[in-house]
Amino acid sequence: MNLRPLHDRVIIKRLDQESKTASGIIIPDAAAEKPDQGEILAVGPGKRDEAGKLNPLDVKVGDRVLFGKYAGQTVKVDGDELIVMREDDIMAVVQK
């Protein structure tokens, strides 16, 4: 992937959603909602404060995160659908 996010942006790949419910019902792709979880593939250097100091991001590559359904901008890179969003749009990091 030749994509490097700027400032406080991150690049996220959505995680695959279960295609079957707990009771065994198979959900077709057309009816399935896009998952609101993903894995961070790249992070920007951070955001500068008013004094010009660079504040690094709290998230890192490999983190599994939760974000809003409409957060970020979807882009296609090398056939993969990725999301570019600001760190502020990330709601939580999923602890392993």
UniProtKB/Swiss-Prot annotation:
GO CC, one annotated term:
cytoplasm
Q: Which GO terms describe its molecular function?
A: ATP binding; metal ion binding; protein folding chaperone; protein-folding chaperone binding; unfolded protein binding
Which SUPFAM superfamilies does UniProt cross-reference here?
GroES-like (SSF50129)
**Keywords assigned by UniProt, alphabetized:** Chaperone, Cytoplasm
The residue stretches assigned to a coiled coil in this entry are none
Give its localization: Cytoplasm
Chaperone as UniProt keyword: yes
Instruction: Output the InterPro entries linked to this UniProt entry.
Output: Chaperonin_GroES, Chaperonin_GroES_sf, Chaprnonin_Cpn10_CS, GroES-like_sf
Q: Does the keyword Oxidoreductase apply?
A: no
One biological process term from GO is: chaperone cofactor-dependent protein refolding
Q: What does this protein do?
A: Together with the chaperonin GroEL, plays an essential role in assisting protein folding. The GroEL-GroES system forms a nano-cage that allows encapsulation of the non-native substrate proteins and provides a physical environment optimized to promote and accelerate protein folding. GroES binds to the apical surface of the GroEL ring, thereby capping the opening of the GroEL channel.
Per the record, the similarity remark reads:
Belongs to the GroES chaperonin family.
Q: How does it assemble?
A: Heptamer of 7 subunits arranged in a ring. Interacts with the chaperonin GroEL.
| Protein name per UniProt | Co-chaperonin GroES
Q: Which organism is it from?
A: Polynucleobacter asymbioticus (strain DSM 18221 / CIP 109841 / QLW-P1DMWA-1) (Polynucleobacter necessarius subsp. asymbioticus)
Record lineage: Bacteria, Pseudomonadati, Pseudomonadota, Betaproteobacteria, Burkholderiales
Q: Which gene encodes it?
A: groES
